[in-house]
């Protein structure tokens, strides 16, 4: 792969990663399709995808830095408060949201990696879309937690249980957690924010583990390509998160569910 071509591929995949990582549409499904169409597959491609996820994670940190620092007791000025009462989101909420998927992910890490194939991703796209529709149809008419700071520890833990569905490649971590939050009585907006905050430790841990296992596939020659992908993913993810949070104030997740079905059909057409 020529230098110019490899950098172009990196930029395209960075855009795809940044656009889809935090939307409930499955970044995995999109990366599989686009990577296949670009002829960028194999061990190096998998390592590249792990690295550019760090760019997406950095976008969340930049967006929610004040809230994230506040969770660990470091305060800069007045802390944000989004709720109807005096409650506050704590580090305990994040930890409870992490526990179920961390335990299952560590125990079944190799098994989960073996599930990364187009068939499983296609089915996960469909099932995840159905869950989004179910969440919109079955959520309480009046959310019990309108704001992020109204969330209970029980709601955080149950969202963590739903996050386990995202261990199924193609399901979408944000789709699973947001759907779970809505079914637990958390508003669409607050569930999305919690999903983003929960993504930081979850994705950093998973990425660190994957990088450790993929370290041998990294070469000095790949650094420019990986850097372009990382920066592109960061910039695009930053824009995507801001746009998404504004969008869900006006629309439901039904269009995202329909889009997932379209992507599932695309996976079928491309690979079968």
From Swiss-Prot:
The keyword Methyltransferase does not apply. The lineage of its organism: Bacteria, Pseudomonadati, Pseudomonadota, Gammaproteobacteria, Enterobacterales. It is a multi-pass membrane protein. It comes from Citrobacter koseri (strain ATCC BAA-895 / CDC 4225-83 / SGSC4696). It comes from the Bacteria. One of its GO terms (biological process) is cell wall organization. This is Undecaprenyl-diphosphatase. One of its GO terms (cellular component) is plasma membrane. Bacitracin is thought to be involved in the inhibition of peptidoglycan synthesis by sequestering undecaprenyl diphosphate, thereby reducing the pool of lipid carrier available. Catalyzes the dephosphorylation of undecaprenyl diphosphate (UPP). Confers resistance to bacitracin. GO terms for molecular function: undecaprenyl-diphosphatase activity. HAMAP family: Undec_diphosphatase. The chain crosses the membrane at residues 4-24, 45-65, 89-109, 115-135, 152-174, 189-209, 225-245, 251-271. Its EC number is 3.6.1.27. It holds the Pfam family BacA.
């Amino acid at each position: 792969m020529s230098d110019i071509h490899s950098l172009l591929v990196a930029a395209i995949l960075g855009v795809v990663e940044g656009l889809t990582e935090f939307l409930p549409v499955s970044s995995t499904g999109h990366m599989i399709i686009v990577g296949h169409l670009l002829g960028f597959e194999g061990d190096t491609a998998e390592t590249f995808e792990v690295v550019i996820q760090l760019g997406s994670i950095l976008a969340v940190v930049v967006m929610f830095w004040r809230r994230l620092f506040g969770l660990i007791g470091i305060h800069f000025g007045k802390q944000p408060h989004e709720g109807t009462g005096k409650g506050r989101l704590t580090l305990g909420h994040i930890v409870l949201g992490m526990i179920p998927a961390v335990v299952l992910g560590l125990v079944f890490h190799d098994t989960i990696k073996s599930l990364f194939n187009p068939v499983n991703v296609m089915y996960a796209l469909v099932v995840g879309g159905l869950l989004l529709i179910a969440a919109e149809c079955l959520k309480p008419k009046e959310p019990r937690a309108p704001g992020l700071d109204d969330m209970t520890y029980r709601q955080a833990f149950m969202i963590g249980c739903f996050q386990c569905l995202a261990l199924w490649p193609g399901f979408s971590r944000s789709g699973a957690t947001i759907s779970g939050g809505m079914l637990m009585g958390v508003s669409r907006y607050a569930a999305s924010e919690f999903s983003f905050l929960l993504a930081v430790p979850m994705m950093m841990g998973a990425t660190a583990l994957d990088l450790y296992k993929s370290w041998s596939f990294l070469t000095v020659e790949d650094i420019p390509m990986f850097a372009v992908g990382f920066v592109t993913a960061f910039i695009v993810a930053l824009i995507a998160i801001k746009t998404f949070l504004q969008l869900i104030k006006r629309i439901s997740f039904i269009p995202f569910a329909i889009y997932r079905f379209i992507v599932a059909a695309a996976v079928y057409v491309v690979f079968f």
